[in-house]
Amino acid sequence: MSNELIYGIHAVNAVLQRDPARFVEAYVLKGRQDDRLLPVLNELMRLGVSIQEMSRKALDDKAEGANHQGLIARVKPARQLNENDLDDILAQHEQPLLLVLDGVTDPHNLGACLRNADAAGVAAVIVPKDKSAPLTATVSKVACGAAETVPLVRVTNLARTMRALQEKGVWFVGTAGEATHDIYQSKLTGSLAIVMGAEGDGMRRLTRETCDDLIKIPMAGSVSSLNVSVACGVCLFEAVRQRMANR
């Protein structure tokens, strides 16, 4: 696999904290010196990472116009997690909270969902290999470092993985507009996986049928649905609220 670009202070700092050996080189805006950037640059230099100063136009071109905050790094790709890693992840959590994204192919939405997952303490985000956005620099930037901290598990057969986790005691709750009860009427404690579908299409049929329960977010206005990353945040933090109340 070829090296990857990550950009933005949050994303670079997250890799520094978790896996600094991945760094190949870094590019920084010429003349930029500020309190947020300097500690990151100092740590990169301490690690012996080559740092090149570049003009804003050169950085913009390298980041393909995305907001890079004056810092881009070239890193070795992280090891891609798969279904075989789930047992180890579950073993680290007494009552894991998981997030399943079925068909989220927009990198901005995936990045925002990863950021939500990190904030909510999600043990892992599970996606199908064939129906998910790849982990690009855009995803890492939108995720503000969460793409480097939240385990992203790509599985070959999502329904089969769900059934295997059900046998280990994980309860799967899917989100669907036609559900008969909403998230505030549902128990979201214990070993739980919240399943979100793609915007518009929702969950695929087999994913929906494999869920233990279906819930919806109550909508009071004229809009029929929320952006998937917004809906993801609403559901995850209702689960967090219930879990905190049960302590």
UniProtKB/Swiss-Prot annotation:
Catalytic activity: guanosine(2251) in 23S rRNA + S-adenosyl-L-methionine = 2'-O-methylguanosine(2251) in 23S rRNA + S-adenosyl-L-homocysteine + H(+)
SMART domains registered for this protein in UniProt: SpoU_sub_bind (SM00967)
Coiled coil: none
Record has Mitochondrion as a keyword: no
Main subcellular location of this protein, as a coarse class: cytoplasm
Residues at which S-adenosyl-L-methionine binds: 197, 217, 226
Annotated S-S bridges: none
Lineage: superkingdom: Bacteria
Gene Ontology cellular component terms for the protein in this record: cytosol
Matches recorded under Gene3D superfamilies: 3.30.1330.30, 3.40.1280.10
UniProt cross-references to CDD domains, sorted A to Z: SpoU-like_RlmB
A molecular function GO annotation: RNA binding
Pfam family, one: SpoU_sub_bind
Subcellular location per the Swiss-Prot or TrEMBL entry: Cytoplasm
EC number: 2.1.1.185
Its biological purpose: Specifically methylates the ribose of guanosine 2251 in 23S rRNA.
Sequence similarity: Belongs to the class IV-like SAM-binding methyltransferase superfamily. RNA methyltransferase TrmH family. RlmB subfamily.
Annotated protein name in UniProt: 23S rRNA (guanosine-2'-O-)-methyltransferase RlmB
